[in-house]
Amino acid sequence: MYSFFVLASLLGGALASPVLGLRECTRGSAVWCQNVKTAADCGAVQHCLQTVWSKPTVKSLPCDICKDVITAAGNLLKDNATEQEILMYLERTCDWLPKPNMSASCKEIVDSYLPVILDMIKGQMSHPGEVCSALNLCESLQKHLAELNHQKQLESNQIPELDMAEVVAPFMANIPFLLYPQDGSHSKPQPKKANGNVCQDCIQLVTDVQEALRTNSTFVEALVDHAKEECDRLGPGMSDMCKNYINQYSEVAIQMVMHMQPKEICVLAGFCDEVKEMPMKTLVPAEVVSENVIPALGLVEPIKKDPAPAKADIYCEVCEFVVKEVAKLIDNNRTEEEILHALDKVCSKLPTSLAEQCQEVVDTYGSSILSILLDEASPELVCSMLHLCSSRGLPAATVRVMPRKDGGFCEVCKKLVGYLDRNLEKNSTKEQILAALEKGCSFLPDQYRKQCDQFVTEYEPVLIEILVEVMDPSFVCLKIGACPAAHKPLLGAEKCVWGPSYWCQNMESAALCNAVEHCRRHVWN
């Protein structure tokens, strides 16, 4: 039953392209061999079987299911089963599809192309994979590797596995049918969507099933036994194959049911409408929102409020996990853009119960975590800097020591001003800059802190005055004398002291005053 369900579902999508005209058929194998429908319309079925569909394929569950179904269908033909009997099996499977338009499309395809499919089965009984490639249920290995080639270098010749979550989803979608078999007429109307009570009934049913799975071990056995009884409805041959798949995948399906939301399962089953917009996150107190939205507040005293210990510990653990993942990506020489893109998938490695908190940390602090680590900060200190972990009991920081450059305070000046530039908002007041300066040195690696404190003590007055106007590290440190001047003197230096109103009036002035980066980040954006 499951095999035919998956086969019919994928068949409907694979063969849903429009009928080709004569003009399209002149374009060669790339058009002919898309699927059974295009090959039949262009009279190229045998050509595609011999030259395209016989190539190696990616190992995947849909491909394996298809091969078993085609083999079983071939055995039924050997046993003198009629085409009408096979058609009946496929049409019955089409009736199980959750949406009326999918069911109708599935039946139309089966009715129109059954002779072609049966001819292929008869001629390729020893090679069912070729038939499955024609049905687009087995993917070409060459095509798959070509798509991966632009993302990463192929490291081995092992055939890649596909995502198990995608292929097991149809099994979970059929759970309500297993508990309450649908034996009525195929022409009965489909259940109403979420605007009636059916959606809520489905959610309640799945909720009860999940609760029973958690608390009653015998319920799991009864559920699996009931599913195997349903296999007997398929008749000889198919029944054994159906039970074999239940033995292999029932445990995986049950685990996924346990970790999915009831509404998600009911959407897959077609009893609830899919929600198009993104779900709203849980609202949090206003002061926590402001602290999360502006990472710069990491430099200010935290609000005197004792958060719930359990919640604080969770965010601390999640932050430490994200920091470790980012550190691994940095060690692998990934670019900043690649790291930020990879962060979107980091939370999928955590249990579902932590995924929401993880996504909050990534969305709010992802860029700050990356910036702090790129400034050579110790990974153990990052979450404390962001006030997500307590600083008590931290181990001695192990930092990657960077070679110092000539120029006195030049290196530490650039690091400090660069950190302030990333974390202070535009038009910050002198008081905000002073507060940030007083604490800024504690955010730098150990080897820079002592020198940073000395630098702030010596340059604080002039530093605050210029930081009110500009925070470009190279310009500021050169202007206050912390970094040595270039070999060629700056042209037009008198005009450059006029500030951003002169620097950013055009690209020529910005380049003349070494303020291009400042203008891009603070004025021209």
From Swiss-Prot:
<feature type="propeptide">
    <location>
        <begin position="488"/>
        <end position="525"/>
    </location>
</feature>
<feature type="disulfide bond">
    <location>
        <begin position="410"/>
        <end position="483"/>
    </location>
</feature>
<feature type="disulfide bond">
    <location>
        <begin position="413"/>
        <end position="477"/>
    </location>
</feature>
<keyword id="KW-0325">Glycoprotein</keyword>
<dbReference type="GO" id="GO:0005764">
    <property type="term" value="C:lysosome"/>
</dbReference>
<dbReference type="InterPro" id="IPR021165">
    <property type="entry name" value="Saposin_chordata"/>
</dbReference>
<keyword id="KW-0458">Lysosome</keyword>
<dbReference type="InterPro" id="IPR008138">
    <property type="entry name" value="SapB_2"/>
</dbReference>
<keyword id="KW-0732">Signal</keyword>
<dbReference type="InterPro" id="IPR011001">
    <property type="entry name" value="Saposin-like"/>
</dbReference>
<dbReference type="GO" id="GO:0005615">
    <property type="term" value="C:extracellular space"/>
</dbReference>
<feature type="disulfide bond">
    <location>
        <begin position="231"/>
        <end position="242"/>
    </location>
</feature>
<keyword id="KW-1015">Disulfide bond</keyword>
<feature type="glycosylation site" description="N-linked (GlcNAc...) asparagine">
    <location>
        <position position="216"/>
    </location>
</feature>
<dbReference type="InterPro" id="IPR008139">
    <property type="entry name" value="SaposinB_dom"/>
</dbReference>
<feature type="disulfide bond">
    <location>
        <begin position="441"/>
        <end position="452"/>
    </location>
</feature>
<dbReference type="InterPro" id="IPR007856">
    <property type="entry name" value="SapB_1"/>
</dbReference>
<feature type="domain" description="Saposin B-type 4">
    <location>
        <begin position="406"/>
        <end position="487"/>
    </location>
</feature>
<feature type="glycosylation site" description="N-linked (GlcNAc...) asparagine">
    <location>
        <position position="427"/>
    </location>
</feature>
<feature type="glycosylation site" description="N-linked (GlcNAc...) asparagine">
    <location>
        <position position="101"/>
    </location>
</feature>
<dbReference type="GO" id="GO:0060742">
    <property type="term" value="P:epithelial cell differentiation involved in prostate gland development"/>
</dbReference>
<keyword id="KW-0677">Repeat</keyword>
<dbReference type="InterPro" id="IPR008373">
    <property type="entry name" value="Saposin"/>
</dbReference>
<feature type="disulfide bond">
    <location>
        <begin position="347"/>
        <end position="358"/>
    </location>
</feature>
<feature type="disulfide bond">
    <location>
        <begin position="202"/>
        <end position="266"/>
    </location>
</feature>
<dbReference type="GO" id="GO:0016020">
    <property type="term" value="C:membrane"/>
</dbReference>
<dbReference type="Pfam" id="PF02199">
    <property type="entry name" value="SapA"/>
</dbReference>
<feature type="propeptide">
    <location>
        <begin position="143"/>
        <end position="195"/>
    </location>
</feature>
<feature type="propeptide">
    <location>
        <begin position="392"/>
        <end position="405"/>
    </location>
</feature>
<dbReference type="InterPro" id="IPR003119">
    <property type="entry name" value="SAP_A"/>
</dbReference>
<dbReference type="GO" id="GO:0060736">
    <property type="term" value="P:prostate gland growth"/>
</dbReference>
<comment type="function">
    <text>Saposin-A and saposin-C stimulate the hydrolysis of glucosylceramide by beta-glucosylceramidase (EC 3.2.1.45) and galactosylceramide by beta-galactosylceramidase (EC 3.2.1.46). Saposin-C apparently acts by combining with the enzyme and acidic lipid to form an activated complex, rather than by solubilizing the substrate.</text>
</comment>
<feature type="disulfide bond">
    <location>
        <begin position="199"/>
        <end position="272"/>
    </location>
</feature>
<dbReference type="InterPro" id="IPR051428">
    <property type="entry name" value="Sphingo_Act-Surfact_Prot"/>
</dbReference>
<feature type="disulfide bond">
    <location>
        <begin position="316"/>
        <end position="389"/>
    </location>
</feature>
<keyword id="KW-0746">Sphingolipid metabolism</keyword>
<keyword id="KW-0165">Cleavage on pair of basic residues</keyword>
<feature type="domain" description="Saposin B-type 3">
    <location>
        <begin position="312"/>
        <end position="393"/>
    </location>
</feature>
<comment type="subunit">
    <text>Saposin-B is a homodimer. Prosaposin exists as a roughly half-half mixture of monomers and disulfide-linked dimers. Monomeric prosaposin interacts (via C-terminus) with sortilin/SORT1, the interaction is required for targeting to lysosomes. Interacts with GRN; facilitates lysosomal delivery of progranulin from the extracellular space and the biosynthetic pathway.</text>
</comment>
<comment type="function">
    <text>Saposin-B stimulates the hydrolysis of galacto-cerebroside sulfate by arylsulfatase A (EC 3.1.6.8), GM1 gangliosides by beta-galactosidase (EC 3.2.1.23) and globotriaosylceramide by alpha-galactosidase A (EC 3.2.1.22). Saposin-B forms a solubilizing complex with the substrates of the sphingolipid hydrolases.</text>
</comment>
<feature type="propeptide">
    <location>
        <begin position="276"/>
        <end position="311"/>
    </location>
</feature>
<dbReference type="GO" id="GO:0005770">
    <property type="term" value="C:late endosome"/>
</dbReference>
